[in-house]
């Protein structure tokens, strides 16, 4: 491996940092030695209606049970809004920056309180109760945050579906959690293009009805004023409804382990999993990681560029920052609209201090050269962050030297939908940085590397990343399917949470995430199960079989490479290729569009019928010199055809 460039903690980073290296080492040791005492103390960072007396009650064995602060009573929206009103009611809670650079607004904590209470009362008026599931399918507008917080105020469980997902994907998520109330907008706006959210919702509701889940009401925010279909009695205009209710709504007293939200994520088997997070442990962990990972100080302007449809938006646009009384920026647009300078212009316009984005955006912007960055000052920046996938050292150095002018620490954070918050990360005033490494575990997090047989690897090693004990932000179950939860995360290596990621630990104890080791690919920082894309392809009537693998992609990190076998008598044509791409977009959404489709007469299978994905990956990477033993294949000649017709030939 090439020489790793270490960036030592600069004196300026250390000067006002919340944590230095000695403090990190002490706190970390305490958190591992005595988790009850450590989290008992930090559990008090949120306000409780009834304090907890039990801290940790968790087991990774057998049935797997995870409970934190279980006898306490609290409320998330109270912690994100009410408790701040006395001290910072007139402070900006949310800065909203629209798709169009001239479109922005600021919402204070007082205004946030009123809007969330009104929306909570609208839901109550229409029969939404504690424990009911509410589906949110929204653009990046403040009402998306109001909807989340209003659910938490009345104890409803929200399930947010990313606005880029198709009607079919939305319907599947409505059906799985039997949601009867949906909040959406007429249209979304992204990069100057409108997205037909209400139209998609109408289609999804029809599909859900065929699966015996009847949506009673759809609350529609007017974003663009575009024309939409309307079902009187079912559909409600947001602006009409909030005008008819009171601006006060008492927060429900929620048990620490009451469900907070469900967020669907791709798995290595076809059906998306409803990751379930609960109330108190999640909020303690999201707010604590937000404070210490980003070295958040009172008054900082904080911007995470994610969408609330992903877990990063849940934890680090809404819940973490607002629980800490921060000013959080919500961005509706994309990095390159109307120009390649957009991110940096927004940073200057709103004097952003902490900026958190994804490697895929950075690689695309890096490709546009340094000029769009250099046009802006960015002098307000104090901390930079990266999330969603491992960041390659070249992109890291560009981020550090060009965006941060070599003066701003980068926190390269590793975590997952399932973990609720950041697990492995540098801390700005404490951790020497290495380009491409997530560095060290956060407090209370016990990483372990194991080999394929489950043998624990000590010291510098390369293996599968597991976590050996619970932390408060951990998911509790797969919604409606606890067996799947145990099977997916705790059966590969007994008594350990298996992350599904490969990882290398270097001689300094730093962790380097090497990517998924299961059948999940990471496209632009978003997880996509290969099985999901395969089932979408196979549902086309001309396709007999499909296999999907990831391959290295300059911008997205990983691209989607599909091998497709057609039904007898069907001809592989360019038109069919386009038709299949459109079909996948309809089934799942644009995010799952195959980058390459290779028509193949057959797939490499063992005699027992198992597809040899290892071989398909190598061919997709144009690296077939090390295909290994193909003698176990039922028909070794298939491989020659795949190599001859590969789509990624170099040179």
Swiss-Prot record:
It is an enzyme of class 6 (ligase). Mg(2+) binds at residues 538, 540, 543. Keywords: Acetylation, ATP-binding, Ligase, Magnesium, Metal-binding, Nucleotide-binding. Acetylated. Deacetylation by the SIR2-homolog deacetylase activates the enzyme. ATP binds at residues 388-390, 412-417, 501, 516, 527. CoA binds at residues 190-193, 312, 336, 524, 585. GO terms for cellular component: cytosol. The keyword Magnesium applies. GO terms for molecular function: acetate-CoA ligase activity; AMP binding; ATP binding; metal ion binding. Pfam families: ACAS_N, AMP-binding, AMP-binding_C. The modification N6-acetyllysine is found at residue 610. CDD domains: ACS (cd05966). Its EC number is 6.2.1.1. InterPro entries: Ac_CoA_lig (IPR011904), ACAS_N (IPR032387), AMP-bd_C (IPR025110), AMP-bd_C_sf (IPR045851), AMP-binding_CS (IPR020845), AMP-dep_synth/lig_dom (IPR000873), ANL_N_sf (IPR042099). One of its GO terms (biological process) is acetyl-CoA biosynthetic process from acetate. Belongs to the ATP-dependent AMP-binding enzyme family. Catalyzes the conversion of acetate into acetyl-CoA (AcCoA), an essential intermediate at the junction of anabolic and catabolic pathways. AcsA undergoes a two-step reaction. In the first half reaction, AcsA combines acetate with ATP to form acetyl-adenylate (AcAMP) intermediate. In the second half reaction, it can then transfer the acetyl group from AcAMP to the sulfhydryl group of CoA, forming the product AcCoA. This is Acetyl-coenzyme A synthetase. It comes from Mesorhizobium japonicum (strain LMG 29417 / CECT 9101 / MAFF 303099).
């Amino acid at each position: 491996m090439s020489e790793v460039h270490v960036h030592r903690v600069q004196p300026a980073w250390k000067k006002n940092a919340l944590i230095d290296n000695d403090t990190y080492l002490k706190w970390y040791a305490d958190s591992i030695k005595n988790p009850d005492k450590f989290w008992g103390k930090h559990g008090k960072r949120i306000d409780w209606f009834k304090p907890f007396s039990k801290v940790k009650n968790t087991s990774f064995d057998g049935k797997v049970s995870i409970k934190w602060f279980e006898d306490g009573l609290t409320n998330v929206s109270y912690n994100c809004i009410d408790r701040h009103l006395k001290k910072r009611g007139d402070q900006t809670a949310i800065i909203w920056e629209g798709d169009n650079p001239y479109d922005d607004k600021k919402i204070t904590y007082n205004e946030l309180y009123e809007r969330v209470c009104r929306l909570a009362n609208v839901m109550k008026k229409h029969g939404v109760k504690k424990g009911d599931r509410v589906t949110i399918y929204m653009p990046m507008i403040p009402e998306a945050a109001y909807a989340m917080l209003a659910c938490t105020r009345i104890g409803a469980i929200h399930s947010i579906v990313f606005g880029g997902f198709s009607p079919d994907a939305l319907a599947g998520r409505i059906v799985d959690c039997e949601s009867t109330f949906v909040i959406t907008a007429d249209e979304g706006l992204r990069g100057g293009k409108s997205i037909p959210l209400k139209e998609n919702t109408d289609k999804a509701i029809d599909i859900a009805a065929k699966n015996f889940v009847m949506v009673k009401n759809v609350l529609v925010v007017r974003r663009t004023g575009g024309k939409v279909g309307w079902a009187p009695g079912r559909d409600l205009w947001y602006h009409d409804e909030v005008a008819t209710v009171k601006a006060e709504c008492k927060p429900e007293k929620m048990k620490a382990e009451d469900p907070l939200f469900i967020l669907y994520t791709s798995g290595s088997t076809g059906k998306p999993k409803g990751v379930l997070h609960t109330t108190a442990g999640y909020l303690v962990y999201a707010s604590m990681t937000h404070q210490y990972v980003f070295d958040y100080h009172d008054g900082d302007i904080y911007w995470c560029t994610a969408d609330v449809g992903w877990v990063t938006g849940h934890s680090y646009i809404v819940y973490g920052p607002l629980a800490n009384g921060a000013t959080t920026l919500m961005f509706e647009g994309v990095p390159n609209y109307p120009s390649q300078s957009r991110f940096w212009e927004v940073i200057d316009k709103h004097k952003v201090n902490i900026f958190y984005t994804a490697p895929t955006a950075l690689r695309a912007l890096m490709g546009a050269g340094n000029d769009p960055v250099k046009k802006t000052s960015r002098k307000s920046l104090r901390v930079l962050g990266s999330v969603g996938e491992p960041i390659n050292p070249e992109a890291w150095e560009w981020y550090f030297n060009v965006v941060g002018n070599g003066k701003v620490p980068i926190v390269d954070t590793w975590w997952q939908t399932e973990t609720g918050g950041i697990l492995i990360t540098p801390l700005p005033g404490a951790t020497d940085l290495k380009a491409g490494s997530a560095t060290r575990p956060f407090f209370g997090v016990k990483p372990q590397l194991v080999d394929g047989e489950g043998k624990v690897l000590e010291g510098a090693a390369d293996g599968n990343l597991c976590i050996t004990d619970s932390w408060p932000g951990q998911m509790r179950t797969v919604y409606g399917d606890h067996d799947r939860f145990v099977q997916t995360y705790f059966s590969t290596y007994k008594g350990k949470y298996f992350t599904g990621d490969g990882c290398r630990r270097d001689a300094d104890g730093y962790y380097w995430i090497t990517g998924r080791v299961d059948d999940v690919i990471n496209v632009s920082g978003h997880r996509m199960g290969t099985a999901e894309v395969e089932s979408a392809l196979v549902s086309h009537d001309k396709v007999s079989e499909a296999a999907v693998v990831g391959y290295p992609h300059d911008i997205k990190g990983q691209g989607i490479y599909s091998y497709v076998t057609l039904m007898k008598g069907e001809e592989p044509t360019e038109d069919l290729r386009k038709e299949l791409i459109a079909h996948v977009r309809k089934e799942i959404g644009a995010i799952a569009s195959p980058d390459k489709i290779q028509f193949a007469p057959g797939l490499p299978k063992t005699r027992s019928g198992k597809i040899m994905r290892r071989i398909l990956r190598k061919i997709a990477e144009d690296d077939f010199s090390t295909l290994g033993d193909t003698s176990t294949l039922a028909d070794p000649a298939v491989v020659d055809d795949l190599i001859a017709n590969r789509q990624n030939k170099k040179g």
